[in-house]
Amino acid sequence: MQSWSRVYCSLAKRGHFNRISHGLQGLSAVPLRTYADQLIDADVTVIGSGPGGYVAAIKAAQLGFKTVCVEKNETLGGTCLNVGCIPSKALLNNSHYYHMAHGKDFASRGIEMSEVRLNLDKMMEQKSTAVKALTGGIAHLFKQNKVIHVNGYGKITGKNQVTATKVDGGTQVVDTKNILIATGSEVTPFPGITIDEDTIVSSTGALSLKKVPEKMVVIGAGVIGVELGSVWQRLGADVTAVEFLGHVGGIGIDMEISKNFQRILQKQGFKFKLNTKVTGATKKSDGKIDVSIEAASGGKAEVITCDVLLVCIGRRPFTKNLGLEELGIELDPRGRIPVNTRFQTKIPNIYAIGDVVAGPMLAHKAEDEGIICVEGMAGGAVHIDYNCVPSVIYTHPEVAWVGKSEEQLKEEGIEYKVGKFPFAANSRAKTNADTDGMVKILGQKSTDRVLGAHILGPGAGEMVNEAALALEYGASCEDIARVCHAHPTLSEAFREANLAASFGKSINF
């Protein structure tokens, strides 16, 4: 990827883009007009500034393309930076510290406090400070890389034109060689339940509650549900998650890991009702909410009363008023934009990436697609191995995985072997008094090649990147087992699990 950057930056400086046979059609550099003009000419126009959009815009500019990024919100960064990944991680981290201090954890380490008090306003302030710094950072990167930022609601008004409607009703027209749709996703509504972001909230409202609820019900025990539910459970709420499926952690999680994960969360005080569906919710005169539930297969109805109801049943692609219908670009049955392997829609110069196309709705997946997509516009190779895209649940302990689960391997009829290592036998986890969880490695029986890695425990979100690298390069379990890992570190558990998978036995367990 770096070599492509050097080649195209060099060509851009020498004005040779029009000689690239696979590049943008008619890509001679065109001077960009200022904001005061009615029209902007560009080579690439990105609609959306979330992880996929802003990264794609910067990469396009670095490749020498005249780039515009249209964003409907006042701040850059999309859902992830403003009301998703970033603020939730701030609350997850700080609520974990509070939980340690308020419970017996600190005392067991010899740290004694006479009084531990939660200042929720201060916690929210720290979250907002982090968000502001990062969104401002994107604005700085745009300026540094000469990406033109247009604040307005972007609509494709022609195969070579985007019109941004601003808050004041004014419009900015961009004539562009290529268009990249990176508009992300929005919260999936629950039929019959109206979200007011006050007491019936989506993930957005759950990040900004004014006080800790006495009782909270979470609809959905997937990634977002367990993350946000655990935040408020740690801060003192009585939290119950109602999940239609028979496990926690969402789609893709290994079932053995999921069961252990659920057990640990329950030990912390998080409650679950699995194989259960929500049939409705009613606000009472005292402000509380009655949530009606019953077994997923049907059965006796039950009512749970709560102060706050959090709806976390997933997200759906955001393609509203993009102008796709007028262009003849149809959506698939799940509302996604169909694209080919180069991320092109049925109109070759209109591309789409991230949550609006097929695949997991992950920020890092969108970032990778954004980079690869614009490199493809410039004539570069386009390839992503989606089997090597990791997933992380940022609770404590964390859960992370990449590659195949045991259930997937069984379904596909692939013969495999398993290597496991518990954090209870890891010296660093022991010294940290943080020993819940394990590392589980799945290797191909005939070749020893790593097929999947599943981690439940401290630092899982960092450790999984070593596993992703191993899968990307087709490493064997023995390859990893023979790599010297620093001692004492948590990642030694990853090596030990690969020892167990390759040789049938780990050293320290």
Swiss-Prot record:
Residue numbers carrying Phosphoserine: S285, S297, S502
Residues holding NAD(+): G220, A221, G222, V223, I224, G225, V226, E227, E243, V278, G314
Chain sites annotated for binding FAD: 71-80, 89, 154, 183-185, 355, 361-364
Cofactor binding mode and count: Binds 1 FAD per subunit.
Localization in the cell: Mitochondrion matrix; Nucleus; Cell projection, Cilium, Flagellum; Cytoplasmic vesicle, Secretory vesicle, Acrosome
Posttranslational modification: Tyrosine phosphorylated.
Feature type site, description Important for interaction with PDHX and activity of pyruvate dehydrogenase complex: D448, Y473
Cofactor(s) listed: FAD
Matching PANTHER family: DIHYDROLIPOYL DEHYDROGENASE, MITOCHONDRIAL, DISULFIDE OXIDOREDUCTASE
Other facts: The active site is a redox-active disulfide bond.
UniProt family annotation: Belongs to the class-I pyridine nucleotide-disulfide oxidoreductase family.
NCBIfam families documented for this protein: lipoamide_DH
Protein name per UniProt: Dihydrolipoyl dehydrogenase, mitochondrial
Organism: Macaca fascicularis (Crab-eating macaque)
